[in-house]
UniProtKB/Swiss-Prot annotation:
This is T cell receptor alpha variable 39. Coiled coil: none annotated. V region of the variable domain of T cell receptor (TR) alpha chain that participates in the antigen recognition. Alpha-beta T cell receptors are antigen specific receptors which are essential to the immune response and are present on the cell surface of T lymphocytes. Recognize peptide-major histocompatibility (MH) (pMH) complexes that are displayed by antigen presenting cells (APC), a prerequisite for efficient T cell adaptive immunity against pathogens. Residues 19-110 form the Ig-like domain. Alpha-beta TR is a heterodimer composed of an alpha and beta chain; disulfide-linked. The alpha-beta TR is associated with the transmembrane signaling CD3 coreceptor proteins to form the TR-CD3 (TcR or TCR). The assembly of alpha-beta TR heterodimers with CD3 occurs in the endoplasmic reticulum where a single alpha-beta TR heterodimer associates with one CD3D-CD3E heterodimer, one CD3G-CD3E heterodimer and one CD247 homodimer forming a stable octameric structure. CD3D-CD3E and CD3G-CD3E heterodimers preferentially associate with TR alpha and TR beta chains, respectively. GO terms for biological process: adaptive immune response; response to bacterium. PANTHER family: IG-LIKE DOMAIN-CONTAINING PROTEIN-RELATED, T CELL RECEPTOR ALPHA VARIABLE 39. One of its GO terms (cellular component) is T cell receptor complex. Disulfide bonds join 41-107. Pfam families: V-set (PF07686). Residues 1-18 form the signal peptide. It comes from the Eukaryota. Keywords: Adaptive immunity, Cell membrane, Disulfide bond, Glycoprotein, Immunity, Immunoglobulin domain, Membrane, Receptor, Signal, T cell receptor. It comes from Homo sapiens (Human).
Length: 110
């Protein structure tokens, strides 16, 4: 089995009304082809809007998903994202990982 690499970074942003924290877990993930993985994104605001991005080495950010409401679920290929605004949590599921999914993944809220 080939080993894949997904780097997961967390973003911390400031707002005028206070500090907004966005944290992803795990921060680093070494994937194996064919396995399933989940990336968690916790945030401190009451925002109903969450974004997932992907960045390949040497390239600009690519928008994957925009989740606009509690319970929202979106899927594209082997990636599926969901949003639970009550828990202030979003997840990005990677199903049957393949080499093309090796990238850096980001979540963000506004």
């Amino acid at each position: 089995m080939k080993k894949l690499l997904a780097m997961i970074l967390w973003l911390q942003l400031d707002r005028l009304s206070g500090e907004l924290k966005v944290e992803q877990n795990p921060l680093f993930l070494s994937m194996q082809e064919g396995k399933n993985y989940t990336i968690y994104c916790n945030y401190s605001t009451t925002s109903d809007r969450l974004y997932w991005y992907r960045q390949d080495p040497g390239k600009s950010l690519e928008s994957l998903f925009v989740l606009l409401s509690n319970g929202a679920v979106k899927q594209e290929g082997r990636l599926m994202a969901s949003l639970d605004t009550k828990a202030r949590l979003s997840t990005l599921h990677i199903t049957a990982a393949v080499h093309d999914l090796s990238a850096t993944y980001f979540c963000a809220v506004d």
